[in-house]
Amino acid sequence: MRAVSHRRLLLSFLLLLGTEVVMGQSPTDIIRLQTTKAVGEEINIEIAATEGGAFTVEGLNGNEDDGYTVSAQTIVVKGDVESIICYKCDLVQIDLSACHRLRKLDCRGNKLTTLDASAVDSLQWLACNDNELTALNVDNLKRLSELYCHNNKLTSLQVSTNEALTQLYCATNALSTLDVSKNAQLHVLICHQNQLQVIDVSNNAALIQLSCAENQITKLDLSHNAALKTLGCGVNKLTSLDVSRNPALETLLAYENGLTNLDLSKNPALQRLSVGNNSLTALDLHQNPLLTQLKCKQNNLTDLDVSGLEKLAVLDCSDNQLTRLNVERNAALSTLRCAGNQLESVNVQPNVWLVTLDVSHNKLAELDLATNTMLAELYCADNQLTSVNLESNTGLRTLDVEKNKLDSLKLEANTMLAGLACGHNAIKTLNLSANVRLKELYCVDNKLETLDLTNNTKLKMLHLDSNQLREISWANFGKLYSLSLVGNQLSADLLSQMLDALPKAPEATEEEQTSFKWGVADISENPGTANANTTKASENGWKVVAKVSTGIQTLRPNEAEAYLRYDQVGAMLHATAAVAKIALYSIDGRLMRQIEAGQEGVSLRDVPAGICVAVAYSRSGKRLASLRIAR
């Protein structure tokens, strides 16, 4: 069946009446599309004719208004076509060799391995990103102004003849070279995640945005780019960066390089700065009063003056060597992360808009949060806090107070709380009756004897190891997918009742069971462990672990200590010689990174605050141990 479209048919007819020229005298454009969609399957194609033009379509049933279905896997478009949008149509081939009027082609998200557009000299806009392209020919397209070819497999790209190009997106390919010296009109160049060692933009004076992050660039000359507003050059091999000729710069992302100093005195328009994971020993921000975001974590800073940054909303200066930090004049702060320093005090009373506060791994003995009524996330683990008053923080959703000196924790006012980590303290009682939204509870290594969870029916993870629990009350464990009660004083009857109350176990891989205890109920080392009835829980798909102690020796050794050790002070993860690889997971099972184990240890300073799990593997790929780490 042939689908026919006419635009302004009456106008075309009148024009033909007034001239002897007929449409048949002009060459007919032909575009062929090959799809793997089955005959009868819906396909989303939008085709627009030129002004006064018409086209026919073979291989499709239907029309643009009601939608098309495939009648043949080779689709042929003939006529005066100005634009084709064939996004996610399972195309494996596009033939443009007989096409000369097309201005716009959108073939994103298909299965193309090659694309030759060189015959379409009228083309102005081409989006072929998110395919499997190993070759792309755009030679001699003098009118092409925008090219989007990112997320492909290109090893080379020639754009020297595309002199009208203003925007080039070629990120996430395998390019080792890129010549843009002939593209003087280029405004936007996005080439991150390639294999570039050099990027020369000296002839691109009109450049406003440059993203060349995650390459292998060692030097970057920006002296000819005075109009530059946004620069992303993170994760390269830069040891120096000169931005003194870029007065319009508003965003600078230069994280994960080898920078030892950075002069920002000529960048008064700067609003966003990210220079984390470098080797900076100082950072002068006196000439950057417009900064709203400052990320300078994991450097060697001993001092940081942010007193002149009244617009600052986000500050992350974690993992430096700061002994003091004054944020009293930063009233607009909504996020403050200063974990992993040597702070003995921090005053956040003027910061009434704070939503996220991370002061973990410092030397704080007290923390006043009375004025921070907007606080939703609080991380203050590994300090020297003996108490923490959260009565004013009624919107708190996440709380991590692990590894302090707390003997009590009052949470009656925190009715929004969903995640609580309070392990490794000396807490004797814990009232959770008001925390009805609680989903995750980590309260290991405390001194709890009883715990009432009657109102906590949304719990998904419940870890209460190494307490003195004799009694636990609950109403419903219907959402639970991880239970750990190791090393308490629980009877066989109580353990049996808790196991019987478990729902169907969640589907979990062996890795998820081992590292995150998904679908695992561990009741080891309790007085009632040996006699607990595990039948129903096992029938519900739970992996029940019920190891028992034999006096001083235990049949359940600490597997982690034989392979992994975490140094909290230096944020270093050390592995024994048997470990070849370490995988880091978030607590919800997301793989964050894989690391080759070494004798010097692995730095975790750039790992986000919170709880993660390190899993050790041998050279043969065998899993050796897992270690839960609080950052």
Predicted regions and their residues:
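LRR N-terminal entry segment and analogous cap-like coil->beta motifs
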Residues: E51-G53, G59-L112, V120-S122
